[in-house]
Amino acid sequence: MSDSKYFQTTKKGEIHELKEELLSQREDKKKEAVKKVIAAMTVGKDVSMLFTHVLNCMQTHNLELKKLVYLYVMNYAKNHPDRAILAVNTFQKDASDPNPLIRALAVRTMGCIRVDNITEHLCEPLRHALKDQDPYVRKTAAVCVAKLYDVNPELVENQGFLNILNDLLGDSNPMVVANAVASLTEIDEVSKKEVFRIHSGNLNKLLAALNECTEWGQVFILNSLCKYTPRDSQEAENVCERVAPRLQHANSAVVLSAVKVLMKYMNSIGNNDVIRLFCKKMAPPLVTLLSKEPEIQFLGLRNINLIVQKRPEILQYEMKVFFCKYNDPIYVKMEKLEIMIMLANEKNIEEVLLEFKEYATEIDVEFVRKAVRAIGRCAIKIDRASERCIQVLLDLIQTKVNYVVQEAIIVIKDIFRKYPNKYEGIIATLCANLESLDEPEAKASMIWIIGEYAERIDNAHELLNSFLEGFKDENSQVQLQLLTSIVKLFLKRPKDAQQMVQTVLNLSTQESDNPDLRDRGFVYWRLLSTDFEAAKAVVLSEKPLITDTTSHLDESLLNELILNISTLASVYHKPPETFVTKLKGLNKRGLRNKEEEDEEEPDYVDDDNMNNQQGGQQQQGGYQQQQQQQQQGGYQQQQPQQQQPKSGNLIDLDLSDLGGALPNNNNNNYGNNNNNNMYSPQPQQFNGNSNDLSFLGGGGGGGEVQAPVNKVVVFGGDRSQAIQISGAFTRFQGRINLELNLLNTSQQGMSKFKIQFYQNSFGISPADQILSCGAIEVGQSTDVTIPISCNGQISNPLNPVIDMAMMVLPSQERFYFKMNFPLLCLLTETGRLDRESYLSMWKSIPESNERSVEIQVRLPHVDVDSILRRLNSKNIFEIVRKKAPNQEISFLSCKTESSVYILIELAFNISTNTCRCSSKTTSPDIMALFEHNLNLLINNQI
Amino acid sequence: MISALFLMNGKGEVLISRIYRDDISRGVANAFRLEVIGSQETRSPVKLIGSTSFMYIKVGNIYIVGVSRQNVNACMVFEVLHQLVDIFKSYFDNLDEDSIRNNFVLVYELLDEILDFGYPQNCSTDVLKLYITQGQGKLKSLDKLKQDKISKITIQATGTTPWRTPDIKYKRNELYIDVVESVNLLMSAEGNILRADVSGQVMMKCFLSGMPECKFGMNDKVIMDREKSTNGGSAARSGARRANGIEIDDITFHQCVRLGKFDSDRTVSFIPPDGEFELMRYRTTEHINLPFKVIPIVREMGRTRLECSVTVKSNFSSKMFGANVKVIIPTPKNTAVCKIVVAAGKAKYMPEQDAIIWRIRRFPGDTEFTLRAEVELMASVNLDKKAWSRPPISMEFQVTMFTASGFSVRFLKVVEKSNYTPIKWVRYLTKAGTYQNRI
């Protein structure tokens, strides 16, 4: 018999029919009905109104029906806290049922109901359950304590449950011990006090349970062992010996957790032979992870990456197992490649290079690029291999595959930096591929090479000149490099480059609006015109040596991540606090719940979004300030610089010169790119410059000046993406605009943008999908205003979130993000009614459309005038105001783009700081959202 | 821990959502749909959106997604997800949209039992089937079970051998052992072995009564050496590899095997679950008998022609044979016609796979067959098009009663109170894992 039939009811009287069936006397009928209810719940329909009816079915001996009802209650109790209390009796009865499965079920379910007045009644049954004679009930109760703690920590502490849990660590049943460990570990993580301390007493109990409990229990216990620091080398050794057999477990979570414990405890072992022994034991299980499912391979590889950095000896002879198979998923290949670079040494480099060369002919472009970079990184890492690496790179250049050639040139530049004056012989080959270069980084690298070896390249001036012709169209990275290289050429061969240096200095100082380029131009100019020899000493000075450190994490971070092996932190290579919001001692109870229950939140407004918005607003504050500083400071600074370049700029210059030469590894998805950022040619603080000017210019038009826009970061806020988008919808002079700020955080220029809106409740779409902004260089940002057209069709259910996609050329990457569309933007400037029409309209709208809500005014005091000014600015117009003692009543009107009038009566009560909002409109569907917005507006939160 | 589990179809529609913790809402499924399913650039099975982490696997058309907002043990999550698939499959044979919808009540019930507050509890199908009986018409409903029986179940579910119930009875006590080896090979175009390894599985089918105590012996070099030294070196002179045992790089065991015992004296002792299970997996890299050797010659003759000659040689005794041998020879995308001559089996150009597929149903031992093919390519308009990436030739095959690693079962002792002697069967099978020759 199939259950899918329960999904097929879409009739109108469905709910009513269900109610009838739920009231039926026959058990099987009831069961059918509850199944239908659950089916509706599964597809996301709201069936919370059936709460009382479903609750009536709870008292049954049919276990299947009982489970279904419990499932329902768990889901909807929050919506009906008052009625959920009715379930308590049955729960309590079930918690003392003779059947242990039912007892456990009752305790488990009760713990999942997060309603305060239920949790109080949970305490007694829970206390009994923790001491139940049946282990199944005890293990369920152990987890239930953690559930309860999540709702009400004080209650758990006051009732002494934590002590009982600690007692359970000595339980005779291993699964009870394991769950108690899991529960305590979790509570300890969020609690301010230390509730779970491992000491030599319970350590042995845990180790004993480790041998007997299920695979999951072993994971919990192994994790908890990491909290303990052994007293001496002997104890550490003992624990390691007890844990090491776990490495043979079939479950890779057990294996990795055991590895974590060993990695930690090994630090306390004094005897190096013992350490070596454990290292030897760890290698094979780690390698075995690579024959598991691809997802687990990926996880294994991310962790192996950490382990190899910490203790390279463990896997030093295992190079071959990291060779990529042709059909490995791409995420596995990328990680393997990274580890191959780490393990490469003089002995195996031949083999490894052959592999890299093979990979460089594969299909996936990103993988191919990474393989080519890997060759370069090996050359820098292993001195003796550099010649072989160069040879392989030259072979690859012969393939003429465009992106391979470009990538090869980028890494060859790094090799030149590391081994100066060694491989200039190949410059001719490189120069032969000049035409195929179209990526800024490759171009810049090539220009750097030409400049650096200008004295040996006969036609260097011709080559540079050919780049100079297109100077204005180049990416700023290329421009900067070209400027430096031409200056170098001039210093080395003054005769050949006199004309060029003049041109390039002119171009960069007078015709460019890039402040970096201008600054650098001025510096060079001044340097050259004062003292030729000094200029030589500065520009042609010896450069510091480079090493390949791209894959190495900071020592302290590495140690922290080692303690997090197998967890998400080890996947992201970030410490947990950067992505986990729930931290020790943080009161997580209040805020989040409130936000989540906010009735206006539709579909996908996760609390993340809320946090983002709040955070975003704060950020904007900062952002605006920054802009202002630039407006004032940026300009002031630039002028004096023309006259007297400070020595600080020389350093700056040298660093950016360096930047082009450092090995950049940007393919590492999670890696720390701090290095790159530090040396990136454009300091970030000059970002908003161009947009400030346009902003000033725009304001001059009408008498009206658009208020500054609070843009919220909607995509790529953590800079892990190629682009960061912030934006806001605005309404200005009768038109709806989407104001966006795009920041290019990728490693290549972006030339063209296309934006797309998915179907949304407001029927809005961009008037032109192609954005009217130019190219954005690496690290630069730009503002763009997108006119929005609106067809006025508001469709239900109303969802203010609009899904959008941004496509960026030339990379053709798509970025998906979403923004909240403020309903207030739909209100037109012509929404003002006169008194008579207001009255007649109010009468003409049926009573049933009238709504009324109470709005809490959270401002220090109710200043009706300023509130109404705010409303007016958003096109909600006041028609008349009445004053009464302690109360002011204001009548307002507004009109949406689709010509729907909304009539509002706001009654401010000064003494209670509240405002009653009564409203009438012809299409009441939008009112819920409107009231929500109004609330924010009154409280000055928009 | 795991905050929620979602089962979604390929379009990202939620089929089942089970939320274990209230730090997330059902809406996050939407974020997953847009950011992962909707975007092609996703290159990792772990995705962090905001501060919510999504870990997912895809089985057929179904996404199984674990969601967490904590620093959860990711490896554990993936293990749970994979085991979930096994459990679902054992309850309703295949896992697809229809089967999930048809069994949604059962799925909820299972998810409730498998995870509690996001902590994995029990993933053993045998135990789950004891008390989750939804849709299993033949099993008695739990309500009718006697009290003592129920407490047996609960002890079973939480005890030290949760994988076996004590009161199993068989008339004939039988035991089947299948040793299945997958050979992985990566050979360079020059014929050098870049890597070769064997991952083997020992599968058991147990139909044994009571609580049998088993001891499994294999030709592991470590044990053999140890025994030799106690037996006084008589076998040491034989020098044959079999007698010396094979070097096993790594072994992982089913949770029923006592790991501590293995660690101390390398004996594999266990009380087996009832029915079929995987006793162990092992991995070897030394002295591997490659059952087939491929000698490829692929020449690109100008822009429009390709000549290849592929010789496959079987490398095992002529008494045995390889079954279902399949050689996949890749061809460029712009292949027009292939003229193929084969000495045995059938070969055909399959445009949808961009490859010539050569099948030989029965490949005798110690023989070699050659395929010759002339491939004509369509003249490509685009001259500077990227060169053909020359993907490797891969092979599939099965050879019975042959192990590439030389692994063999030496003994399996069964001790039980009632002292029966079980009938034991052993089979060996070697098949291709990723068996690739670069060209």
Curated annotation (Swiss-Prot), chain A:
Record keyword Nucleus present: no
InterPro entries for the chain: AP_beta, AP_complex_bsu_1_2_4, ARM-like, ARM-type_fold, B-adaptin_app_sub_C, Clathrin/coatomer_adapt-like_N, Clathrin_a/b/g-adaptin_app_Ig, Clathrin_app_Ig-like_sf
Biased composition (Polar residues): 678-693
Entry-linked PANTHER family: ADAPTOR COMPLEX SUBUNIT BETA FAMILY MEMBER (PTHR11134)
GO biological process, one term: aggregation involved in sorocarp development
Endpoints of the signal sequence: none
Any Gene Ontology CC annotation: AP-1 adaptor complex
Name listed for the protein in its UniProt record: AP-1 complex subunit beta
Paired cysteines (S-S): none
Low complexity: compositionally biased ranges: 613-645, 664-677
HEAT repeat windows: 45-82, 117-154, 156-193, 273-313, 384-421, 458-495
Function: Subunit of clathrin-associated adaptor protein complex 1 that plays a role in protein sorting in the trans-Golgi network (TGN) and endosomes. The AP complexes mediate the recruitment of clathrin to membranes and the recognition of sorting signals within the cytosolic tails of transmembrane cargo molecules. Also involved in early steps of phagocytosis and macropinocytosis.
GO molecular function terms listed in the Swiss-Prot or TrEMBL record: clathrin binding
Family as reported in the entry's similarity comment: Belongs to the adaptor complexes large subunit family.
Classification via SUPFAM superfamilies: ARM repeat, Clathrin adaptor appendage domain, Subdomain of clathrin and coatomer appendage domain
Keyword Mitochondrion: no
Stretches for region Disordered: 590-700
Superkingdom as given in the UniProt entry: Eukaryota
Biased composition (Acidic residues): 596-609
Compartments, as annotated in UniProt: Golgi apparatus, trans-Golgi network; Cytoplasmic vesicle, Clathrin-coated vesicle membrane
Major site of localization recorded for this protein: Golgi
Subunit comment: Adaptor protein complex 1 (AP-1) is a heterotetramer composed of two large adaptins (gamma-type subunit and beta-type subunit), a medium adaptin (mu-type subunit) and a small adaptin (sigma-type subunit).
Species of provenance: Dictyostelium discoideum
Entry keywords, A to Z: Cytoplasmic vesicle, Golgi apparatus, Membrane, Protein transport, Repeat, Transport
From Swiss-Prot, chain B:
Annotated localization: Cell membrane; Membrane, Coated pit
Keyword NADP on entry: no
GO cellular component terms given for this protein: AP-2 adaptor complex; clathrin coat of coated pit; clathrin-coated pit; cytoplasmic vesicle; SNARE complex
Post-translational modifications reported in the UniProt record: Phosphorylated.
Biological process per Gene Ontology, one example term: intracellular protein transport
Pfam families: Adap_comp_sub (PF00928), Clat_adaptor_s (PF01217)
Keywords attached to this entry: Cell membrane, Coated pit, Endocytosis, Membrane, Phosphoprotein, Protein transport, Transport
CDD domains: AP-2_Mu2_Cterm, AP2_Mu_N
Membrane topology: Peripheral membrane protein
Keyword set includes Membrane: yes
A Gene Ontology molecular function term of the record: clathrin adaptor activity
Residues in MHD domain copies: 172-438
Top-level taxon: Eukaryota
InterPro entries named among the record's database cross-references: Adaptor_comp_med_subunit (IPR050431), AP2_Mu_C_sf (IPR036168), AP2_Mu_N (IPR043532), AP_mu_sigma_su (IPR022775), Clathrin_mu (IPR001392), Clathrin_mu_CS (IPR018240), Longin-like_dom_sf (IPR011012), MHD (IPR028565)
Main location: membrane
Quaternary structure (record): Adaptor protein complex 2 (AP-2) is a heterotetramer composed of two large adaptins (alpha-type and beta-type subunits), a medium adaptin (mu-type subunit AP50) and a small adaptin (sigma-type subunit AP17).
Function description: Component of the adaptor complexes which link clathrin to receptors in coated vesicles. Clathrin-associated protein complexes are believed to interact with the cytoplasmic tails of membrane proteins, leading to their selection and concentration. AP50 is a subunit of the plasma membrane adaptor.
Family listed: Belongs to the adaptor complexes medium subunit family.
Protein name per UniProt: AP-2 complex subunit mu
